[in-house]
Amino acid sequence: MDLNNLRFAPQMFRYLNGGHFICASARNEDQKKWFDALEAGWEDYAEAWRKTTGFELARGDGYYYFRKKITGDNRSFEKVAADYRDYCTMVDLLYRLDQSFCVGKVVTKSWALQCLEANPAAQETCRTLFKGTTKNDWADELIEQLRKYEIVDSFMNEEQYEIYYPVTEAFDYYRTFIETIQFSSKEIEKSVEDAPEDAPSLFEESGAAEE
């Protein structure tokens, strides 16, 4: 292991430990450097963090993240259940709104409003999931949730004077997570679906270090 290659390790660790992704499409200059560093020598970073912290660095197609450890205890199971339920809900809503939703697509608030206007079923889903009572409220909340989950990045389009939200590689993480979960029985599948609403989430900063 060449320790000279690990100069970004402390900053990246804090970021990944918060439940965040480091994506190829990142617009933040520091995160671009981090992604390039991981691409150049991710094995060294993975080995260093595994030895010093026990965390496992995993990578997908254009993104890196800390893989969650599932030990079989009830708390870990509840965390998986919460993640699975949240991911399914969000991905299902996005595909209801726009079946062409994918990595690289650029969305806006006006996109969200147009999709909601054209989809009464999605409106009912938003009425249940989000605060507020109008399509404008739900569009704002949807964008906020997409940013929370890091499904989108953001930048200001100066010509249109509108914030653009390009879809990041993290979206593929959620789809893959859902597609690769396999249940050994219908009872276990139901227990995941019925997991407590207040179960910890991958995106809670305070819980990430306990995985």
Residue ranges of model-derived segments:
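Minor-groove-contacting beta-hairpin "wing" of winged helix-turn-helix DNA-binding domains
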Residues: 63-67, 159-167
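Short amphipathic alpha-helical interaction segments
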Residues: 37-45, 130-148
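A short, conserved structural fragment
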Residues: 50-58, 143-158
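Short basic alpha-helical hairpin corresponding to helix-turn-helix/winged-helix-like nucleic-acid-binding
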Residues: 58-114
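Short, amphipathic alpha-helical interaction segments positioned at domain boundaries
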Residues: 77-82, 168-205
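Short, positively charged loop/turn segments that connect secondary-structure elements
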Residues: 117-137
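Eukaryotic partner-binding/assembly regions in large regulatory complexes
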Residues: 1-76
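An N-terminal structural lobe/cap that precedes and organizes the functional/catalytic core
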Residues: 209-211
